[in-house]
Regions:
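Paired small-residue
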Residues: 136-144
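Cytoplasmic membrane-interface "Motif A"-like loop-to-helix N-cap segments
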Residues: 103-118
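Juxtamembrane intracellular "pre-TM" segments in multi-pass secondary transporters
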Residues: 5-46
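A late C-terminal transmembrane helix in Major Facilitator Superfamily
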Residues: 166-198
Length: 199
């Protein structure tokens, strides 16, 4: 780390990003990081807000799929386990492909990839919710949701890093993560969904 006297990693590897300037190496005060690069960054706030809804779907499915499949759709516990596992395993190729699409096809424009993935998530959530006859369609929908939801989880964090200078990257990522975990998971996926289920 530079704090121990080492040079910046870009200089050490002679691998500078396109938008690099010596200015990015200057030390920033906590106030500058927080107010100039995080609190006043409207796009960062938009993606933090969007992250709450990404996490609503992620943890809504993660927390409620076993109960929904067993109690509403009539799965036995063994089939619930397989469906739930498939949802999680589908995340691995989905996240890798999402990153590749974002970098190679859309040239680093993270929002486009995220919007495509989330539109497809919405389609498969509706299919998963409305389908009452086909176990195969339930499983395909759950796998598709797992494949598609983890890409935006990853890309929102990456986009937060893209939107802030290197010295403010942790704070920017922390803001989006806070919105995801606190508002998306704790408030919406757990408290709000639990209240809806009970009433």
């Amino acid at each position: 780390p530079q704090s121990t006297g080492l040079p910046p990693i870009e200089k050490y590897r002679n691998d500078y990003p396109k938008n690099y300037s010596e200015k990015s190496e200057q030390e920033l005060t906590t106030k500058e990081i927080f107010f100039k690069y995080v609190l006043n960054n409207k796009i960062l706030w938009y993606i933090a807000f969007a992250n709450a809804f990404v996490y609503l779907v992620r943890y809504g499915v993660l927390d409620w799929a076993p109960t929904y499949l067993k109690d509403i759709k009539g799965y036995d516990i063994k089939d619930v386990g397989w469906a739930y596992s498939a949802y999680e395993w589908a995340a691995i190729p989905g996240t890798i492909i999402c990153g590749w699409l974002s970098d190679k096809v859309f040239k680093g424009r993270r929002a486009i990839t995220t919007m495509i993935y989330m539109a497809l998530v919405a389609v498969f959530v509706v299919i998963y919710w409305k389908n009452m006859d086909s176990v195969l369609l339930d499983n395909i929908s759950l796998i598709a949701i797992g494949f598609l939801i983890y890409g935006p989880v990853m890309l929102i964090g990456v986009q937060a890093l893209d939107l802030a200078p290197k010295k403010a990257a942790g704070t920017a990522a922390g803001l989006t993560g806070f919105f995801g975990y606190f508002f998306g998971t704790a408030i919406l996926a757990n408290i709000a969904m639990g209240s809806i289920v009970q009433h």
